[in-house]
Regions:
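Active-site beta-loop-alpha junctions enriched in small/polar residues
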Residues: 1-2, 29
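Secondary-structure boundary/capping motif
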Residues: 5-6
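Short, Lys/Arg- and Gly-enriched loop/turn segments at beta-strand edges
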Residues: 113-119
Length: 126
């Protein structure tokens, strides 16, 4: 269950906005602030040294998995939300989809969205 957006809200947004208008984002932020009382066991939020929420540890693969789990989105939809839709929104026409002339930035996953390989500008990352 998400902290930022309730699964019921995810389903509503998908139904109202449609797949072409959903963009997944991630702070993927690391912090070493102390965990304030009442948040014991919460593993996906970072806190600053004042005890305020400083960001999320959520990564895009987990965001994609959450959308698939909570909304019934397909793996194709999940990649659309994480790559194609953001590229279009930012008018980055050289990326976001696999096509001739596009940048070869690829994330290869298994059917459960576990990352297997990352290719950046045509080069496989270690």
């Amino acid at each position: 269950r998400g902290i930022h957006v309730d699964p019921y809200m995810l389903r509503l947004v998908r139904r109202i906005k449609g797949d072409a208008r959903i963009i997944l984002i991630s702070d993927a932020y690391a912090s070493d602030g102390p965990i304030p009382p009442g948040y014991d066991g919460v593993t996906d939020i970072n806190f600053d040294y004042t005890g305020e929420i400083a960001g999320s540890k959520l990564t895009l693969d987990v965001a994609c998995r959450n959308m698939m789990k909570h909304t019934g989105a397909s793996i194709v939809n999940a990649f659309q939300y994480a790559a194609l839709n953001p590229a279009r929104a930012l008018e980055m026409t050289d990326r976001g989809e696999i096509a001739v002339g596009k940048r070869a930035d690829l994330v290869i996953t298994d059917h459960k969205m576990n990352i297997q390989t990352v290719i950046l500008k045509g080069e496989t990352l270690p």
